[in-house]
Amino acid sequence: MPSIEAVGAREILDSRGNPTVEVEVVLEDGTLGRAAVPSGASTGAFEAVELRDGEDRYGGKGVRKAVAAVIERIGPAIIELEATEQRLLDQTLIDLDGTPGKSALGANALLGVSLAVAKAAAAASGLPLFRYLGGPSAHLLPVPMLNILNGGAHADTNVDIQEFMIAPIGASSFSESLRWGAEVYHALKSVLKARGLGTGVGDEGGFAPSLPTNRDALDLIAEAVDKVGLRLGSDVALALDVASTEFYADGSYTFEGSTRTAEELSDYYAELVGAYPIVSIEDPLAEDDWSGWVALTERLGTKVQLVGDDLFVTNPERLARGIASKAANALLVKVNQIGTLTETLDAVNLAHRNGYRAMMSHRSGETEDTTIADLAVAVDCGQIKTGAPARSERVAKYNQLLRIEEELDDAARFAGAAAFPRHGQPA
């Protein structure tokens, strides 16, 4: 396998118009690998650190320091390493940074290099990325968790819950599930217009109307599902990303205009799960509310998927704590939360070995990079959330999954309802 010959980086823009890092790695045979790094809006306190410039340009969000770190510090340290030695490469990056949160060189610098090398190695091997990372058994297409209605930090409205998603679990293939999702998305726009509600979209492409309550959002989606002739529950299930850390302070939650304890908020979720076909709730409680998470998981963990995003931040150490204390039953996977591909794969493997599901995820600040689509198939996630079926930085990932399904042909298998605890064992 060719070794790394050159490493470059540049500042590009993400989908919110903020700078991010793009890295290019060239191998000695001329093979190129390119990767762009995403960025979140609602970020966990325990995520690896993005390196930003803090200067006047771009409101302090420039990434020239991270770009310089790639070119001046990381590049010279990895030249001549074999591109297939991913674990060695990533450990070299971690050691070079030398801080627990990757704050010296920046997780955005490290991740760009880590992913670009993997993509170069796949290309040099003559393999698609999903096959290079996942081996010959990688064939499971994930259920798309389509964020069609936005609130919280992703939209400037009075809706507390950050994401209302649909999961087309009854489809026979990924392509059919994506079609169903797109049809419901367009139907929802019609429903909103008919009621005189706004059809502007949030960061991830979902509509962002002002609504009296969070239940109103679920009812509107249910109407849209019915409008296209699909059955709520068996064809299309519902999912939430509450992002509750955003409204948590001093041990309580400010939700729908009132202050609630973890137990009271758990009562609310129990009511929702009883009233609607909800298969997944992400970050129902805050990243520091471990006791609340344990109690909620004991209460609802056999009925609905409880996903740790801010709780785990794709970090094997935090995930291990969750497994030991029986907090949550699924891991949200965001490559930029931890900063290297190897650590991401380790987190997913730890989750799967302990009976936790894993959901691959984008960030609200995205690019046209499609790495997470391949990664979802490579690690048998069975679930992916990468926004609405709108905005090209979201659709790029879904389109890549269509290509992968086509390439797999008869070997492709769609995760479907079995991906969620409410509908049986994992696929």
UniProtKB/Swiss-Prot annotation:
Originating organism: Frankia alni (strain DSM 45986 / CECT 9034 / ACN14a)
Family matches, as HAMAP family: Enolase (MF_00318)
InterPro entries: Enolase (IPR000941), Enolase-like_C_sf (IPR036849), Enolase-like_N (IPR029017), Enolase_C (IPR020810), Enolase_CS (IPR020809), Enolase_N (IPR020811)
SUPFAM superfamilies in alphabetical order: Enolase C-terminal domain-like, Enolase N-terminal domain-like
Protein name: Enolase
Catalyzed chemical reaction(s): (2R)-2-phosphoglycerate = phosphoenolpyruvate + H2O
EC number: 4.2.1.11
Pathway: Carbohydrate degradation; glycolysis; pyruvate from D-glyceraldehyde 3-phosphate: step 4/5
Cellular component GO terms held in the UniProt record: cell surface; extracellular region; phosphopyruvate hydratase complex
